[in-house]
A protein has these predicted regions:
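Bacterial N-terminal signal peptides that target proteins for export
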Residues: 1-6
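Bacterial signal peptide processing site
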Residues: 18-20
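Proline/serine/threonine-rich low-complexity linkers at boundaries of modular beta-sandwich domains
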Residues: 22-28
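Contiguous segments within soluble domain cores/interaction surfaces
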Residues: 46, 53-83
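Long luminal/extracellular ectodomains of secretory-pathway precursor proteins
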Residues: 72-73, 88, 93-94
């Protein structure tokens, strides 16, 4: 009887150690002056965003999900309003995650479960001329 219990316990342990069937997408992103270089679309599900700053300036990114049928054009209109700087983001912008500021040549990765929908990447840092990287085009849907 004890051999049967030992065999059952071993089988249970092996089953618990089995591989995870969920797939994680790996997506390479590059940040340069002043653009994100990335695929046009990214599959939903668990995704690792592998970011490399290929530029000479500091770069970062914030990942936001857009709700209510909004697009990157709506984000531009919102950010163009001077009042937007003194308010929290609108309810249709859900900041999901981000990576910290990286110097040229540095890399960082971020893993998130991306639900189907529209997302935008933004770099909120300021350029040497005092305008934001977003104003220079570092925003991507």
């Amino acid at each position: 009887m004890s051999k049967l219990i030992l065999l059952a316990a071993t089988m249970l342990l092996l089953a618990a150690c089995g591989g995870n069937d969920s797939k994680t997408n790996a997506v390479e992103l590059r940040g340069d002056e002043y653009a994100f270089v990335m695929p046009e679309t990214i599959e939903s599900g668990w995704t690792t965003l592998e970011f490399t700053n290929t530029g000479g300036e500091l770069h970062e990114f914030a990942l936001a999900k857009l709700g209510g049928g909004r697009t990157v054009a709506d984000v531009h209109r919102y950010l163009a309003d001077p009042k937007s700087q003194q308010q929290p983001p609108p309810s249709w912008v859900q900041i999901r995650a981000g990576i910290p500021t990286l110097e040229g040549g540095e890399e960082a990765a971020l893993t998130q479960e991306l639900e189907p929908g529209r997302y935008v990447l933004l770099c909120f840092l300021d350029a040497p001329d005092g305008t934001s990287h977003i104003e220079h085009g570092m925003i991507r849907e």
